[in-house]
Amino acid sequence: MSNFLPIPTKAATPLPSFAKHLLDYISAHFRDTHSEAFRKDVDVLVGMRKDWVEAKLEAHPEIIRAFMRYHAQLAFLSTKFPSDINLPFAYYLPFPATFSLSPDAPISLSSLTFERACVLFNMTALYASMAAAERRAEAEGIKRALGYLTAAAGVLEYLITSVLPTLRSELSSPQAAGYDMTESFLGTLKEFVLAEAQECYWQQAVLQGTYKNGLIGKLSMKVSEYYKAALASMNGTDYPSSSYFPLNWTAHMNVKQMHFEAAAQFRLSQEDLEKSRYGEEIGRLKVAESLAKKGLDAARKGVADSVVSDLKQLHAAIKSSLERAVRDNDLVYVQPIPPANQLAPIVGVGMVKVNVPAEVAEPVAWLMGGKAGMEPLFSGLVPYGVHLALSIYDDRKDTLVRDLDGKREELDGLAASTLQSLNLPGSIQALDRPVGLPPSLLKKSEEVASSGGIERIRSLLDEVNRLAHANVQSLNEAMDILDQEATENESLIARQPELQQTRQPSHVANQPLIQMAEQYEATIKQAGGSDATVRAKWEEWARLVGILAAGEMEMEDYVPGTTSPSGSLPPSVRPLRASLEELDDRIAHRARLVREARQISAADDIRPEVLKEAAKLAHGGSGDVKTEWFEDLFEKGLEKYMGVKREMDEEVAKHDELLEQIRTQNESFLSERKDDPIIKERERRLQDMDLAYWKWREIVDNAEEGIKFYNSFAEMLHGFKAACGQFLNTRRIDVGQMTTQFQQQMNVSEPQQQPEPRYQSPSPQSFQPSFSPSPSHFQPSAPSSFSSSPVRSPAPSAPARRESPPKTLSFLPHPSSSAWQPASVDFLPPPPPPPILRSGGIQSQPKVAPPVTPSITAIRDQTQGTPRRMTRAAAAAAERDEATERNKYSSGGPRRKGGGVV
């Protein structure tokens, strides 16, 4: 039986939809590409996973090479796809928790990086298993085992330094991928396989029989140091992993550590004997005997018989040598025996070098070089970095066009508010056309009618209202998840009070999420206020907009005519009318500039240039494509918009001059105009129609900006809800881990130090969305600006991340709801905004009291102090009881069915 321990593998769950999902993703996210063109590549990748990853793993070099090919394909695939393609990869833990509520639940993450990490872990396990299976009684077996172990250490080194940081950046908490994907756990395994590799060097030196005792002792001490480093990593301060290893593993490492330190002292005692240092010989033998005894005591906890047998043989040799040395020294040499702290320390000599296989360290280069025996799959797809670069450029040009349009809207709004304050052009039109309607007004009426009129605004406002309610519902669903976690935690503490010392209360653990929820609720409230302002504005102007959109006949009925002779027009009318016509031309010119910018944007495609630059810089696509490579290309591409931007900037100065000129000319016109009541009324109503046009545009812009805001905000709430779900799953799996740790402590005979809680509440940054739309994007504009500032677009991201659901974890199954609520109970809709802190849980255990159905008032008071949502059933029962208390006849005679008292 081998005295090496094999590392168990992580069993993968099948992915029957792997092929379909890849094809659908290619169809949805890769332009100018037909998914069927890559069906063969998809089938090959799916077949590799099914044949090697999902099958029962056997420790064989060909299996490891197959894993290397699959890992290389995944690494190459990561240059084409984002890590999250909305396809969950599920793996079981290598050491299922013995006392977990559900030890067989796999960990599922939508991450290609997680898939790579699990493949590398299994590669390490296969290397260690092959080393444990080698017969090390001969030099060739030792050499093969040494090669396997150094390769295993190299794969773990690559996993810890290259893959794990990327995986950690994708997760909301460090343990979301499982305890086996933490630096503590992987570092323990790395030091463990290095210890076994060093043990191979020590064994080879012993077998050859040509090395001196001093050198063999130093080799042995280095083995002990590696085992000691493994134990230290296991008990690290950041997320220690000691409770996740089986007891026999911990005992095995303790026994090995003391065994080889004792062996080192024994070898150095032989050297002392050769050099006639008899006192030092006895001192080292005593230290060795003490270590061997401790090792034998620790070996009672499930350590393999072969390991115990080796230690017993060493202990027998030490004991025999110590008896001889003491007898000889007492009778012959009579040298003083130094205490253990005065013996010269043994400095270990390490012979092991971490060997990261080239197939693992440079997987893409190995694949592209043809050494893998297969071509890289999906080589015809454009790299994901190129898609990301194109999305960044598209966002920049869209932002530029939006800025131009925003400046146009700002100038047009300033013109509208200025004309409104001057009562123009109604005052001139009333004099110029005593009957009928001005052509400019008829043109505006036609524009409103052709754009949908009042029905368009109604549909837009209805959509705003629908999206607002959907956002409120999303936030409430997220809070329901936190409520559920708080209830489960209280039920858990009630069942297992011993966990209260090591488990954070819900109101502490979820504090970052609660703070974020408060910010989201405040944003929703602010946006709701803006919605109400826009609706009030629409109610005020709906009648006049309806008249404007109804056409010429309706407007003629509204605008009175006059048959009184107006006489000759004042001389100041002509220059004022010319200025107003110039203002209309300026407005039309700015609209043309925006249309021109949009046409340039529609035809602007720098895809060929980006592909060419990516191929040149990445040397044919053999590595990741970085978006910063294309900054010069972006600047060159945006130069085509500079002409339109310069013209729009010039419009600002000309616009201010023209408005000032109109004000001056209007003052001259007012001083020359003759007042007529009929003309005044016609002037007012013409002005109403003109202002109704501008209000129609303003409300349309407000509603469209509101829709953009709520759509952007919905993405944030979707991510927040996913973060709450991940928080719930993390807390659930933490229950199993803490229960396991507690049970292990109870089963260990020696008293051990009480471990600190492993779980730490996620930081606010862990759940922070990448963008924060503000409700100010849906603010009603003042008369000086009929349109609010344009919505800032979310940060550019891959389409997969924008459209796919968030990452989800499937750690422990949902506990039975009967543990905290009857099966018939259904939860009320969210309470009003003030009790947003309802998910904090109960900070202290309530005292046991006889069950009493509280009144509505009591429940309301309670919800203010205890952030717990009330169920419909509880509310109905309380309502009935309160009504009974109010009715003094309730305990008297019978009731009629209609509710009256007889």
UniProtKB/Swiss-Prot annotation:
UniProt feature, compositional bias: Low complexity: 757-799, 866-877
Region (Disordered): 744-902
Domain of life: Eukaryota
One GO term describing the cellular component: endosome
GO biological process: regulation of protein import into nucleus
CDD domains: BRO1_ScRim20-like (cd09241), V_AnPalA_UmRIM20_like (cd09236)
Membrane-crossing segments per the record: none
Feature: compositional bias, Polar residues: 744-755, 854-865
Basic and acidic residues composition bias: residue spans: 878-888
PROSITE patterns: BRO1
Chain ranges of the BRO1 domain: 3-415
InterPro entries xrefs: ALIX_V_dom, BRO1_dom, BRO1_sf
Function as written in the Swiss-Prot or TrEMBL entry: Required for the proteolytic cleavage of the transcription factor RIM101 in response to alkaline ambient pH. May act as a scaffold protein that recruits the calpain-like protease RIM13 via VPS32 to its substrate RIM101.
UniProt record similarity statement: Belongs to the palA/RIM20 family.
Known partners and oligomeric status: Interacts with RIM101 by binding to its YPX[LI] motif.
Name this protein carries in UniProt: pH-response regulator protein palA/RIM20
Species for this entry: Cryptococcus neoformans var. neoformans serotype D (strain JEC21 / ATCC MYA-565) (Filobasidiella neoformans)
